[in-house]
Design a protein with these regions (language model features):
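C-terminal hydrophobic helical "lid"/dimerization subdomain
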Residues: 2-3, 280-331
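Short glycine-centered segments of the SAM/dcSAM-binding site in methyltransferase folds
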Residues: 97, 157, 181, 240-241
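A short acidic, Gly/Pro-enriched loop at the edge of an enzyme's catalytic core
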Residues: 211-219
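Mid-domain Rossmann-like dinucleotide-binding core that forms the NAD(H)/NADP(H) cofactor-binding site
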Residues: 132-204
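Glycine-rich phosphate-binding loop and adjacent beta-alpha segment
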Residues: 223, 227-298, 331
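A structural motif shared across PLP-dependent enzymes of the aminotransferase-like
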Residues: 102-116
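Glycine-rich beta-strand-centered segment in the early N-terminal region that forms part
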Residues: 25-42, 56-104, 223
Length: 331
């Protein structure tokens, strides 16, 4: 094992070319920590928000004029193998294949340290490292939106707006696993993909406006966030639930949070329930997701794979907003 490892860091906010692949000291592990040799990671919209410092709210968290130490790293998903464990670690041993994530980011690196009680569990044997690394953040978001916020039940009609992206591909599959009748909204090139994930109906938004079909849904998982709130409410049943997961980065100061704020204000005065949230990583939900993966009720969808040396290109591609499933980094 060498004394240095390669990792992605950045010292200023800006486009993908601010990212550097640097040599850093090997992470030290404490008595309750695990050293993981990262084999694959993935990128998420939150990565480019932090990279660019946009919306401005991000800078209040990460540093105003430039990212502070600890906030200048990217990547929240990973899969790899255990290299070493602290003396108090009983759950893992060297050689174990694991997957999970880091709340504080930093998985775009050759090695990371993780607490044994952190968001890390054994990798499903039926997945490659690349497939496993594509799962955590997107699957957590879809799971928590459907199960916790929408409280979806078997037989309900669920519409997923943005069905072909990272979160959307998991949302379609999980909604089906929960017994819902699922409609996915996507563009023409992705219709077959969304249908293959189990969607009962697919709406091609380039030829049909899903807000004007006259159909009503019990649950709308709005990942794209590309329609006016009044339009999305129109497709909900009178007591339906709209869960806002994301949306375009409109507004310099708080970006998509402005839409979330409008939902919070409006929800108490209408019969429909309008919910917005930010997903949180936790070990219990990772175990739930792992079971769905092992039983093949859910499968990861990977659009493109890039090496660690091409993270800038990967995030640039993700920023374009047309990824089919996840964008993965091999390490």
């Amino acid at each position: 094992m060498g004394c240095t490892v390669k990792a992605i860091r950045f010292d200023r906010y800006g486009p993908p070319d601010v990212l550097d692949l640097r040599d850093l000291d090997m992470p030290a592990i404490g008595d309750d920590e695990v050293l993981v040799r990262v084999r694959a990671a993935s990128v998420n919209p939150l990565d480019w928000h932090f990279m660019r410092g946009e919306p401005f709210l991000v800078r209040m968290l990460a540093g105003m004029s430039r990212p502070r130490a600890g906030a200048n790293q990217l990547g929240a998903d990973m899969a790899g193998s255990v290299e070493a464990v602290g003396k108090n670690v009983a759950e893992f041993r060297a050689g174990d294949e694991v997957f999970g994530g880091l709340e504080d980011r930093g998985t775009l690196a050759e090695y990371i340290s993780v607490r044994q009680d952190g968001v890390v569990v054994s990798k499903p044997a039926n997945l490659t490292f690349e497939q496993a690394a594509s799962v955590p953040v997107a699957a957590f978001t879809a799971l928590q939106a459907l199960r916790d916020k929408a409280q979806v039940r078997a037989g309900q009609k669920v519409l997923v707006n943005g069905a072909s992206g990272g979160v959307g591909t998991f949302a379609v599959q999980l909604a089906k696993a929960f017994g819902a009748e699922v409609t996915g909204v996507c563009s023409t090139p992705n219709v077959d993909l969304v249908a293959s994930l189990g969607a009962d109906h697919v709406v091609d938004y380039t030829g049909q406006d899903f807000t004007r079909t006259g159909l009503r849904y019990d649950v709308l998982i709005d990942i794209a966030g590309n329609r006016r709130l009044a339009d999305t409410r129109r497709v909900l049943a009178p007591t339906g639930v709209l869960v806002g997961v994301g949306g375009p980065n409109k507004g310099r100061w708080i970006g998509p949070l402005s839409r979330m704020a409008r939902m919070v204000v409006l929800s108490p005065v209408v019969s429909q329930r309008l919910v917005s949230f930010l997903a949180h990583q936790n070990k219990d939900d990772l175990l739930v997701v792992r079971e769905f993966l092992e039983t093949e009720k859910v499968r990861p969808v990977i659009d493109k794979t890039y090496p660690l040396t091409e993270v800038a290109e990967a995030i640039g591609y993700l920023e374009e907003g047309h990824a089919r499933g996840k964008v993965v980094i091999t390490v």
